[in-house]
Swiss-Prot record:
One of its GO terms (biological process) is protein quality control for misfolded or incompletely synthesized proteins. GO terms for molecular function: ATP-dependent peptidase activity; ATPase binding; serine-type endopeptidase activity. It comes from Paracoccus denitrificans. Its EC number is 3.4.21.92. Cleaves peptides in various proteins in a process that requires ATP hydrolysis. Has a chymotrypsin-like activity. Plays a major role in the degradation of misfolded proteins. The keyword Methyltransferase does not apply. Belongs to the peptidase S14 family. Fourteen ClpP subunits assemble into 2 heptameric rings which stack back to back to give a disk-like structure with a central cavity, resembling the structure of eukaryotic proteasomes. Residues 1-23 are annotated as: Disordered. It is found in: Cytoplasm. This is ATP-dependent Clp protease proteolytic subunit. PANTHER family: ATP-DEPENDENT CLP PROTEASE PROTEOLYTIC SUBUNIT. NCBIfam families: PRK12553.1.
């Protein structure tokens, strides 16, 4: 997950758009959003605009397909929070890889609405950031990274049912999970092979 300490925001290691817009990294249709590629501010803005437009049109469930290596933490926060904010149910569907800020978006949905295709991998880890400037600035930035890490640990603990201490320990390094491991961990609700398996 990426964040930058003044945009430098804070960057993590390691898409969607309004109805009429389509691109290789962001394809949309009614009640469907595809988030693919790095999580950036621009992608987050388009995704949120699309989610809000769909929510205004209808209360029907929205399917969000996610395949991402991660990106900016704050951009992931933006999408995560709007998934919870809007009235329609959002079903997140992982494919290929759901990593870092992508995983943060993925757990914006309730556990029973988190799906993935069979060959999906998941990654969670601590945010990373380049710290620079004066000694005072570096202290401030380090404190912001600590607060972000604690907040993300709490989000994933609540999303998975794991103790915060377990999340903190597991994410000291890159923590990869296959589909069965993600199910056991509480990150994933169900593995599906067909759209017909969506409830």
């Amino acid at each position: 997950m990426t964040t930058s300490a003044a945009r430098k925001g804070l960057r993590t290691r390691g898409s969607a758009c309004p109805r009429a817009t389509r691109s290789a990294s962001s394809i949309s249709s009614r009640a469907q959003v595809i988030v693919a590629g790095p999580i950036t501010d621009k992608l987050a803005q388009r995704t949120v605009a699309h989610l809000l437009a769909l929510a205004e049109d209808s209360d029907e469930p929205i399917n969000m397909l996610i395949s991402s290596p991660g990106g900016h933490v704050e951009s992931g926060d933006m999408i995560h929070d709007v998934i919870k904010f809007i009235r329609p149910t959002v079903r997140t569907i992982g494919l290929a890889w759901v990593a870092s800020a992508g995983a943060l978006i993925f757990v914006g949905a309730d556990k029973e609405n988190r799906y993935c295709l069979p060959n999906t991998r998941f990654l969670i880890h601590q945010p990373s950031v380049g710290i620079g400037g004066t000694s005072t600035d570096m202290m401030i930035q380090a404190e912001q990274v600590r607060l972000m890490r604690d907040r993300l640990n709490q989000i994933f603990a609540e999303a998975t049912g794991q103790p915060v201490e377990r999340i903190e320990k597991d994410t000291q390094r890159d923590f990869w999970l296959n589909t069965q491991e993600a199910l056991d961990y509480g990150l994933l609700g169900k593995v599906i092979r067909s759209v017909d398996e969506l409830k």
